[in-house]
């Protein structure tokens, strides 16, 4: 069992989140087609700094993530510093925790703030599913290395003669778990079957997500936290997410065929999050530094937790594992929360985690706890929709959720919010936020 671990520095400062921003999220190969993640990252960080009017030298560290990495820019964080006019002496490094990458980036900046090595930093993430590192076969890669070391033309030709046509085919990024060979959708199908989640339930959650996201845009709730993106060569712009289907009906969802288990499956493209391009970032400071600069924080980070489970069966249970730990460290219960925002990788995964958060048996047998974490109140859950509607640029989603939840907490007069996500590799993340 854990204990209450308040995120307060030795000087008594809380960890303040002073602002957050994201690009609109775009479906793969649409508005951001051809724009690499590093450029999306520069776009959002540059605009975040401009809007905040915080002097660049105030930011002492930038931690950024990218899940689908480009070989030519392996440290996306440093490229963002150099490409946005920030102080060249700003510390910058990159992290990856699959779909929880920007949660990790935030945690790393928080650790620096808690240690006292910095007083302000930026955390975030960017991903592009439209600009991908296309590789070569292992055999071709080995031959190319050997050719580079060959001394004569005859040696080079002999090496190339070993290749067959199939060896020359490009190799796209893997979509399956390295350790198991399972795709994320295969795991979602596992979870639907394990926990008895029907196709109708999944479609209903997906429909709810789109309806609520569309309403959030219609009500103007997202305008402040989503920038307008001007797309090179700057003849077009994108001001809103382009995946949201506000006019869809449940009948539309029912028309789609299963995408993974073709014969007996229930997971479809419509009740899953789509491949997406986008970037998001937040500025964090110690509470006293924010006061010195005359800034009113969006809110504060009260606690966080990361967990890991086995990858072979139902591995997308991160929220069910990490949430009780984050709540315990915050000294709170589910009943104390004003809002709950859970990453919707798949409707099946989301519904399974909701089910297990309220399960006494899961708490006892899996978590070793005496009582269930708590039932999820639908009136508090993903009130503005979730990733199924907005999309999911892997490394950007956590920062989107944090910013979105804090803004909504402030609209409701303050309170506590939980943001939580599953991630590839059986990983989970949860953070408890506070707004006044």
From Swiss-Prot:
- Tell me the active site: 99, 392, 422
Instruction: Report the enzyme's class at the first EC level.
Output: transferase
The main location class comes to: cytoplasm
Pathway stated in the Swiss-Prot or TrEMBL entry: Lipid metabolism; fatty acid beta-oxidation
Pfam families (alphabetical): Thiolase_C, Thiolase_N
Give the keywords, sorted.
Answer: Acyltransferase, Cytoplasm, Fatty acid metabolism, Lipid degradation, Lipid metabolism, Transferase
Known CDD domains for this protein?
Answer: thiolase (cd00751)
Protein name listed in UniProt: 3-ketoacyl-CoA thiolase
Cellular component aspect of the GO annotation:
cytosol
Q: GO terms for molecular function, please?
A: acetyl-CoA C-acyltransferase activity
Name the GO terms of the biological process aspect. Answer: fatty acid beta-oxidation
The chemistry this enzyme catalyses reads: an acyl-CoA + acetyl-CoA = a 3-oxoacyl-CoA + CoA
Please state which protein family the record places this protein in. Answer: Belongs to the thiolase-like superfamily. Thiolase family.
Q: Does the keyword Transmembrane helix apply?
A: no
Quaternary structure annotation from Swiss-Prot or TrEMBL: Heterotetramer of two alpha chains (FadJ) and two beta chains (FadI).
**What is known about what this protein does?**
Catalyzes the final step of fatty acid oxidation in which acetyl-CoA is released and the CoA ester of a fatty acid two carbons shorter is formed.
InterPro entries reported for this sequence: Ac-CoA_C-AcTrfase_FadI, Thiolase, Thiolase-like, Thiolase_acyl_enz_int_AS, Thiolase_AS, Thiolase_C, Thiolase_CS, Thiolase_N
- Does the keyword Lipid metabolism feature in the UniProt annotation? yes
| Subcellular location(s) per record | Cytoplasm
Under Enzyme Commission nomenclature, its number is 2.3.1.16
